[in-house]
């Protein structure tokens, strides 16, 4: 049982569930069966995604992480794959109890998690886009349960852009290791300069879009107090990385701080 818990990565699953709860709060969800089930669905689907990732990464983990459940022999590759598919099936099945939108998101995310681990990890930009969608979709999933989804939909969009910036910066930080594994990330395929400029374009888009939830009337002024500094922090990190003043590792850590500020901005809008 412990080996399967390691395969599922419970901390990651808890973070996915928390993202759904935040989406529900922002979207004004009522405390009912759907609101209770939605975080559980997210955690179960996330567990499936983590397990299928370990299944496809078994050879790499045998060298870099021999203590992981599959290379250590505690879980067979076939059992890991069946566990992942079982998690996807259970998650999608539970989503049918909530509503059609939640069912669609759970089914789509299950397919994307499989495809990402099987074929799309390490592909230029596509992998980054997919991960960023999956991160933001936790808020979208929560929004699908709520009575006023507009604020959480904005959170999904802004979280998608912010995470996209961070994912590209992380690829820049991991160039040496990714190249050794044969991955074709954006900086490996097109150069570090191109990757930095692409990250900055997404950071600019984030800064431009940040005031729109307030201007759209879906959040109040407390949102702006934290959201504008959050966007500025993310843009500054990208610009300083392009200028060479910061390395990619420092920049992506600062972007993470900006993302936390942005999340707090939406929670502040509830006040």
From Swiss-Prot:
Which residue spans traverse the membrane? 11-31, 33-53, 88-108, 125-145, 149-169, 201-221, 224-244, 251-271
The alphabetized list of GO BP terms reads: glycerophospholipid biosynthetic process
Protein's membrane topology? Multi-pass membrane protein
* Pathway annotation from the record: Membrane lipid metabolism; glycerophospholipid metabolism
EC number(s) per entry? 2.5.1.42
Function field: Prenyltransferase that catalyzes the transfer of the geranylgeranyl moiety of geranylgeranyl diphosphate (GGPP) to the C2 hydroxyl of (S)-3-O-geranylgeranylglyceryl phosphate (GGGP). This reaction is the second ether-bond-formation step in the biosynthesis of archaeal membrane lipids.
Q: Which family does it belong to?
A: Belongs to the UbiA prenyltransferase family. DGGGP synthase subfamily.
Q: What is the protein name for this chain?
A: Digeranylgeranylglyceryl phosphate synthase
What is the source species?
Answer: Methanopyrus kandleri (strain AV19 / DSM 6324 / JCM 9639 / NBRC 100938)
């Amino acid at each position: 049982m412990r080996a399967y818990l390691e395969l599922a990565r419970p901390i990651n699953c808890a973070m996915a569930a928390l993202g759904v709860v935040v989406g529900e709060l922002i979207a004004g969800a009522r405390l009912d069966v759907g609101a209770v089930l939605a975080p559980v669905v997210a955690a179960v689907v996330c567990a499936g995604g983590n397990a299928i990732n370990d299944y496809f990464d078994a050879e790499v983990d045998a060298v870099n992480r021999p203590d992981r459940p599959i290379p250590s022999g505690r879980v067979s590759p076939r059992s890991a794959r069946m566990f992942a598919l079982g998690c996807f099936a259970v998650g999608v099945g539970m989503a049918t109890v909530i509503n059609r939108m939640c069912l669609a998101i759970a089914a789509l995310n299950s397919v994307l998690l499989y495809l990402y681990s099987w074929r799309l990890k390490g592909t230029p930009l596509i992998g980054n886009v997919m991960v960023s969608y999956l991160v933001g979709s936790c808020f979208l999933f929560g929004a699908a349960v709520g009575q006023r989804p507009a604020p959480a939909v904005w959170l999904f969009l802004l979280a998608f852009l912010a995470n996209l910036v961070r994912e590209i910066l992380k690829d820049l930080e991991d160039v040496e290791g990714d190249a050794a594994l044969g991955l074709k990330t954006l900086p490996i395929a097109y150069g570090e300069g191109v990757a930095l400029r692409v990250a900055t374009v997404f950071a600019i888009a984030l800064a431009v879009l940040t005031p729109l939830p307030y201007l759209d009337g879906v959040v109040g002024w407390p949102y702006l107090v934290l959201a504008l500094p959050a966007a500025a922090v993310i843009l500054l990190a990208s610009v300083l990385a392009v200028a060479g003043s910061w390395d990619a590792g420092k920049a992506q850590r600062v972007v993470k701080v900006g993302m936390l500020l942005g999340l707090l901005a939406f929670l502040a809008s509830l006040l």
